Amino acid sequence: EIYLSKYSGWYSVRDEAFVADNEIVEKNGKKYNSFGSELSWVEEESYFFRLSKWQDKLLDFYKNNSNFIVPKSRSNEVIKFVESGLKDLSVSRTTFNWGIDVPTDEKHIVYVWLDALTNYISALDYPNKNSDLYKKYWPGIHVVGKDIIRFHAIFWPAFLMAAELDPPKQIVAHGWWTNEGQKISKSLGNVIDPKELIDEYGLDSVRYFLFREVPFGNDGDFSKVAIKNLSLIHISEPTRPL
C-alpha cells in the first residue's frame, strides 16, 4: 500500500497538511488555505499511501453507515470531497529531521498525521488486539474539530481498512469558537482563558452561555458583552424561558 515517489505542492505548516489547488485562497500576493493558514511550496521525495485505491470502499462505507460522520453537513462535505477523486497521500518528509524515522529508510520522517492517528489504538496496547484496553475501547467515537475532519473521516478509516482493522464507530465534528470572527488559536494569540471567565462571571453563567449560543456543529463568536448581557437577563428574569 506504500511506495516511493516525488511530491510537489502547496503545504500549510500550521495545519501540517498539503492543499489542493482548488482550495487555495490568494491574498496580498500570498497563498492561504480555507482556514487562513499561509502556504509554502514544497518539493521532495516522499513515500505515498495508495489512498486512491480506497475511494470506492470509503464511499460504500459512508453509504452503509449513514451516521458515521455527524452532523450531516460534515458528512456531506466529506462525501463530496471523496467523490471528487482521491489522490495518493504523501506519508513521509525529508525536509526536517525530527519525528519518527521510516523504519526502512532513515532519511525519511513519518508524516505527523500518520503517526498521530495511530495513537488512538497504540494507546490501547495495539498491536495486541487481545488486550483488555483494545477490546474495551476499540472501535471508539472520535470528537474532533471541523478543520481536521478529513484526517479522521478519510485518511484514518483508509489506513485502518488497509490494515484490516475496524474503523471508528463514529466521527463527531464540532465547529469553532471564534473571537471577533477569527479562529481561537495559540498561534494567533487570541486565546481566552476559561478560568478567568469563570472567576469573572461564575461557572453556571459560562456553561449556560456556551451551550445556549452555539448549536452543535456550528461556529460561535465569543463576546464578553454577550455573556454579560445573557447573565443579566436571566438573573433579572429567572422565570424567562431558556
Regions found by a protein language model. Name each.
Residues 19-23, 88, 223-224, 232:
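Alpha-helix boundary/capping detector
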Residues 47-224:
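Alpha-helical recognition segments enriched in aromatics with Gly/Pro capping
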Residues 27-28, 191, 209, 229-231:
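Short, intrinsically disordered/low-complexity patches at protein termini
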Residues 1, 9, 75, 145, ...:
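Conserved short loop/turn motifs at secondary-structure junctions
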Residues 1-61, 66-67:
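N-terminal, positively charged nucleic-acid-binding surface of large information/translation enzymes
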Residues 233-242:
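Single conserved hydrophobic/aromatic residue that forms the stacking wall/gate
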Residues 9-16, 175-177, 225-229:
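A glycine-rich phosphate-binding loop feature that marks nucleotide/adenosyl-phosphate handling sites
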